């Protein structure tokens, strides 16, 4: 079987607390691990997307609406729906160990937020930063 869920692929989380949210695969485990003996992936996603900004709004309001919130999660392949999009962001601050240690996870989330905000400010990959309508 062809492995098409590679790192950088944009996916939609289908179940759980973040169902319907867009995420990017950071690291994939096709054969599983000893603790999780099934195919899964470490994903970084948008918990809260940036809102629409207009020129009429003040700088303060524009800055507030441009913020985003991220999440880091290990998800079973059955609960991911791949899209045709990719996002080339280097999430080197996110490791598999960040999932187990809560303090490392908080630091990794902050790092991911910073990287995704930089990507958002460039104006590329607009689809990823919009709310999924359903």
Swiss-Prot record:
Pfam families: KOW (PF00467), Ribosomal_L27e (PF01777)
Parts of the chain that traverse the membrane: none
Residue ranges constituting the KOW domain according to the UniProt record: 5-40
CDD domains to which the protein is assigned, alphabetical: KOW_RPL27 (cd06090)
InterPro entries found in the cross-reference section: KOW, Ribosomal_eL27, Ribosomal_eL27_CS, Ribosomal_eL27_KOW, Ribosomal_eL27_sf, Translation_prot_SH3-like_sf
Keyword Ribonucleoprotein set for record: yes
GO biological process, one term: translation
Keyword set includes Ribonucleoprotein: yes
GO MF, one example: structural constituent of ribosome
SUPFAM superfamilies: Translation proteins SH3-like domain
Superkingdom of the source species: Eukaryota
A cellular component term, taken from the record's GO annotations: ribosome
Alphabetically ordered keywords of this record: Ribonucleoprotein, Ribosomal protein
PANTHER family, per the entry: 60S RIBOSOMAL PROTEIN L27 (PTHR10497)
UniProt similarity note: Belongs to the eukaryotic ribosomal protein eL27 family.
Designated name of the protein: Large ribosomal subunit protein eL27
